[in-house]
């Protein structure tokens, strides 16, 4: 296929798609140019079904530093593992694409997005999402799209689609919404305490804008789209399924209704093992035993799936016996740990998170050097999910995509209420350790983070709580669930996380397993989430009503002084010599910004005070008319040099020592002698002249003797 180009304008910027010129061996490939951002997307599918019990979809978002005219950092000067932002963008694209494949589809699919040029005012992630959907849609991969996504901002009561950098900085909302022509299927958002009504309107505005992008994709697919390949879907043997359902469905139904998680897991596992043992013995000599046992496992999973959903939709019974809108038992604790700067332990049913606060000087901020201009990140929220939290063994190592994503969600939820840098000049790190998990651990980490911040004396604007909402839908009837647990998440259709204060929402995240959800479901879920959020805030505020007025004794204290910008080099010294000497002497940490704000950090107030004295002395300037208690440091024939303070010396000319004539300076002064002097002049080069006699009353002139005349 020769190169074909398709052009439109979206949100005030040119959107150009090129097909047929590059990556022609992939199943589908596109080059998307949005503004001056260029993204190459290639989609590839394996020829055979994978052996696992899940859909092996991999979406990558690769940031090439040349796209922004930069050299990669580090010794190797080559791109390494994806940045946090790249990982989050890959997740952002994966989530709306994944539900658009058929149930039982098991061929491996890879969608690789490579950023070739970068324009900070034209969203490369949104271009990559568009390109991912289009590459799949024009390929022979059986993808039931297209989908598209947009960013939505909110400034002065107006919604803005795909805002530029300046607009996003002024926006009260940073929302990404994706979906198909029919419905929304992915949401990711941070917001400055906006109401449910505004958030819902933003979602609908975003979905409305998506229609234009989907129509553009459909236009392109009509011209260059390939016929979809016939692939084998994972299907179980119908006779085998009927046999197992008839024999064991009643036992599995009973096991599913055991309310306690571990007991329920044991009961369902016992039924499954019994069934597997029977059929493995029955078909032991069959050459297709492996396929049969795979089908047995899949049938049992489908039976459990169907029963959990039936109980909720028909009988309104949840696995643990709760009502549809009921939250699990809550508990909140502060000061769980000694010595740390703040800690909070939050428990919701069998989900428990410990959050630990660390405060540090601003010099500890994380430097983010990606495609965008380098910036410093003051607030970090890290989320850890050890396997013991679900009673299992597993891999331990670097944080995976899920942990990075959950950490970022908590970060968005909490950073909206943090004090400004001027109010609280600290770098802030929260680490959430999930100690138990039965669903909604990311929201528990937000609640625990609120507790840790307030316990640590961080003056947040308001406490934040989070809740996860679920959905069970049969296409006609639906049930929205409050505070979903693991089984409801696993077998449900939606995981809709909502975090916020009493004033409004600070973060949203939605993932679904069906093609999309309606505005009515969104509205109902937001309303139930608000009610639940207020219940959780009641528990948090009963434990700690407001941030403590003081930091923990172990936290670094801070004092800030202002110096003239031209004195910064004096404090730092040649090659950092002066500031290093101060730090070595006092044991403090010092940060100096470009405006002359000097921040001094230490857990020892005396060390801070001593540092302030030293710096004040370094930047102090002599002033004409001021009197100083000085020390003679050098004697010359023409006068004496005296030290006024620190490194500031002055010349006391021989004529300024006394009102009477001084013949030899050394007859009057000696090195090391303390004298009081008054500054009488500072020249344009900063040289200081001082006087001793100016502090001594001038003696009266001697009277003239009368002449005698004979």
Swiss-Prot record:
It is found in: Cytoplasm. SMART domains: KH (SM00322), S1 (SM00316). Residues 556-615 form the KH domain. Residues 691-710 are annotated as: Disordered. Residues 700-710 have a biased composition (Basic and acidic residues). Involved in mRNA degradation. Catalyzes the phosphorolysis of single-stranded polyribonucleotides processively in the 3'- to 5'-direction. It is an enzyme of class 2 (transferase). Signal peptide: none annotated. It catalyses: RNA(n+1) + phosphate = RNA(n) + a ribonucleoside 5'-diphosphate. Pfam families: KH_1, PNPase, RNase_PH, RNase_PH_C, S1. GO terms for molecular function: 3'-5'-RNA exonuclease activity; magnesium ion binding; polyribonucleotide nucleotidyltransferase activity; RNA binding. Belongs to the polyribonucleotide nucleotidyltransferase family. InterPro entries: ExoRNase_PH_dom1, ExoRNase_PH_dom2, ExoRNase_PH_dom2_sf, KH_dom, KH_dom_type_1, KH_dom_type_1_sf, NA-bd_OB-fold, PNPase. Gene3D superfamilies: GHMP Kinase, N-terminal domain, K Homology domain, type 1, Nucleic acid-binding proteins. HAMAP family: PNPase (MF_01595). This is Polyribonucleotide nucleotidyltransferase. GO terms for cellular component: cytosol. Its main location: cytoplasm. Its EC number is 2.7.7.8.
């Amino acid at each position: 296929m020769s190169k074909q180009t398709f052009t439109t304008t979206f949100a005030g910027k040119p959107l150009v798609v090129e097909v047929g010129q590059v990556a022609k061996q992939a199943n589908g490939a596109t080059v998307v140019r949005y503004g001056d951002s260029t993204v190459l997307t290639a989609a590839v599918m394996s020829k055979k079904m994978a052996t696992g019990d899940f859909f092996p979809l991999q979406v990558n978002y690769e940031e090439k530093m040349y796209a922004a005219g930069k050299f990669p950092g580090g010794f190797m000067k080559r791109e390494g593992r994806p940045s946090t932002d790249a990982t989050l963008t890959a997740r952002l694209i994966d989530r709306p694409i994944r539900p658009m494949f058929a149930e039982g589809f098991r061929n491996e699919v890879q969608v690789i997005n490579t950023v070739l040029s970068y324009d900070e005012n034209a969203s490369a992630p949104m271009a990559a999402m568009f390109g991912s959907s289009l590459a799949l849609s024009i390929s022979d991969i059986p993808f039931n799209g297209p989908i598209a996504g947009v960013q939505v901002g909110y400034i002065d009561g107006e919604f803005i689609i795909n805002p530029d950098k300046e607009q996003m900085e002024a926006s009260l909302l940073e929302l990404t919404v994706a979906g198909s022509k029919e419905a929304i299927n992915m949401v990711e958002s941070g917001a400055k305490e906006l109401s449910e009504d505004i958030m819902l309107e933003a979602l609908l505005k975003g979905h409305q804008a998506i229609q234009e992008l989907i129509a553009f994709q459909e236009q392109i697919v009509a011209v260059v789209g390939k016929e979809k390949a016939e692939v084998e879907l994972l299907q179980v043997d119908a006779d085998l399924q009927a046999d197992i359902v008839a024999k064991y469905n009643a036992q599995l139904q009973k096991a599913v209704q055991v309310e306690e998680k571990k007991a329920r897991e044991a009961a369902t596992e016992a039924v499954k093992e019994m069934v597997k043992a029977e059929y493995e013995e029955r078909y032991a000599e069959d050459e297709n035993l492996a396929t049969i046992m795979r089908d047995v496992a899949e049938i049992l999973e489908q039976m459990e799936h169907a029963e959990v959903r039936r109980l909720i939709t028909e009988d309104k019974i949840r696995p643990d016996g709760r009502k549809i809108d009921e939250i699990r038992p809550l508990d909140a604790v502060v000061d769980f740990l000694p010595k740390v700067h703040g800690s909070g332990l939050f428990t919701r049913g069998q989900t428990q998170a410990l959050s630990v606060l660390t405060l540090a000087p601003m010099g500890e901020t994380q430097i983010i050097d990606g495609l965008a201009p380098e910036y410093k990140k003051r607030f970090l929220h890290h989320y850890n999910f050890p396997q013991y939290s679900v009673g299992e063994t597993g891999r331990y190592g670097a944080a995976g995509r899920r942990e990075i994503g959950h950490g970022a969600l908590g970060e968005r939820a909490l950073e909206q209420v943090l004090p400004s840098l001027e109010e609280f000049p600290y770098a802030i790190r929260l680490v959430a350790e999930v100690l138990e998990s039965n669903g909604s651990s990311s929201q528990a980490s937000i609640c625990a983070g609120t507790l840790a911040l307030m316990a640590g004396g961080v003056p947040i604007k308001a406490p934040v709580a989070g809740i996860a909402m679920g959905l069970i839908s049969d296409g006609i009837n639906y049930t929205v669930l409050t505070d979903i647990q693991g089984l409801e998440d696993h077998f449900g259709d939606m995981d809709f996380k909502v975090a916020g204060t009493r004033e409004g929402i600070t973060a949203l995240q939605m993932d679904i397993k069906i093609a999309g959800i309606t505005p009515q479901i969104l509205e109902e879920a937001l309303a139930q989430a608000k009610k639940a959020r207020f219940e959780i805030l009641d528990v948090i505020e009963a434990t700690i009503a407001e941030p403590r007025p003081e930091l923990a004794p172990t936290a670094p204290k801070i004092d800030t002084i202002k110096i003239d910008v031209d004195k910064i080099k004096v404090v730092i010294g040649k090659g950092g010599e002066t500031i290093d000497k101060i730090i070595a002497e006092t044991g403090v940490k010092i940060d100096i910004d470009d405006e002359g704000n000097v921040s001094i950090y230490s857990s020892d107030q005396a060390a801070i005070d001593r540092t302030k004295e030293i710096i004040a002395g370094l930047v102090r300037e002599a002033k004409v008319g001021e009197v100083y208690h000085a020390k003679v440091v050098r004697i010359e024939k023409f006068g004496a040099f005296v030290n006024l303070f620190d490194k500031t010396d002055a010349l006391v000319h021989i004529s300024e020592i006394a009102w009477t004539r001084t013949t030899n300076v050394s007859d009057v002064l000696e090195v090391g002698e303390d004298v009081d002097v008054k500054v009488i002049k500072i020249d344009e080069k900063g040289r200081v002249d001082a006087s001793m006699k100016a502090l001594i009353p001038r003696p009266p002139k001697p009277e003239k003797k009368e002449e005698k005349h004979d």
